Amino acid sequence: EFFGGGRYRWRPEAELVRNVDVGVGGFLVTDLDFETESMDLEFDVPRIQFERGDEVYLEYGIQQEVPTQDFLAAGQLLIPAGNYTWNRIEAGFETTSKEPVEIGGSAGWSGYYGGSRTTVSGDFRWQPMPSFLFTAAAQWNEIVLDTGRLDTWLVSSRLNFYFSPDVSWENLLQYDTQSGTVGLNSRFRWSLRDGQE
């Protein structure tokens, strides 16, 4: 496995913009004969951070997958063995984390094993005080292949209470249409002494 990347940042002479990043990163997985099994190359073109702390970005990527056996995408759509290469593009934004309310969103399109994949996501974070946190997130995926079409939703929410440095209650609720199930994880933590919970 090989991986690497690089980034260049500059600070334009503009009142609203703090910095602009452009970069590239990726990885390559090969077999023992150095034949490609998986490759992912991603370009930030660009990522802009404003003085307030908000960010917007545009990403372009190239991906290659070489499955040696047929398999099911998302457990439902048949993908034959072969050599697949596709492009993808994604744009998104995120508001500053310095405020009690933080929102973000993204939308992307890519090829996908001879077909296409569209993804739209959004998230919301509200922390009016250090002792309370609420988040909500949703992601929609559409996969279109010669063998069929699939829509999936993943929705999640967190509700956390931090009563003191030693006592907290964290809750995660999650639902996805692929499995059709709702999951709830709740954890109460009380540190009686350092290193013990």
Regions found by a protein language model. Name each.
Residues 1-197:
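Exposed, low-structure sequence patches enriched in small/polar residues
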